[in-house]
Amino acid sequence: MKITSRISICLAAGLLCLGAASCKKDTTIQYGNITMGNVDGSTFVSDQGNIFNIVEHEGNTYEDLLKTERAYTLCDILSKTAGGQDNEYDVRLNAMVKVLTKDIVTLETEKTEDILKEDPIDIRNCWFSGGYINFYIEFPVKQGSQTPHTINLIQQETENGYLFRLTHNASGETMENIPSNQFITAGGYVSFPINKVIKEKEAKVKV
């Protein structure tokens, strides 16, 4: 799993403040729109179902967006797309963070020690959107380390509703194995397509 420092995550919040302070003398519909969604060809489709056509972008944000399947984006909605659908807009992409996407694991298909490993992890946020269950997580790492950290969501058998367990394999890079002067916190976004598992319109879910 590629980790992203807290500084990078905070970038979106900083840009949002700048956008809110901008003087709205143009025809821009909205500044500082923050949303998660999927990349579809050269467009971005938000979890709310809006289609964003990237007509302007900062730096390499657009190129980086096209290299991923799912992302958390900060953009300015400039205008409705001429001749487009009712939910289609031209936007300026200001920042983006890649979102890791993984299928949900069942113990019937996977039951290895690596999958079941439960090293400490801090779930800072969890929400449902776009057919996914999304997490923002943090965990300890050694500064400059390239040690891979693996995240999985395991579906467990239950007679009442659905029960899921988020697991973390730190590959030995845990708090007790990191010198105190080399310890930092890293984290990132991860999404699991829960609509592949839950088909009911209403369901009881525990994580």
Name each region found by the language model:
Residues L18-S22:
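C-terminal motif of bacterial Sec signal peptides marking the signal peptidase cleavage site
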Residues M1-C10:
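Bacterial N-terminal signal peptides that target proteins for export
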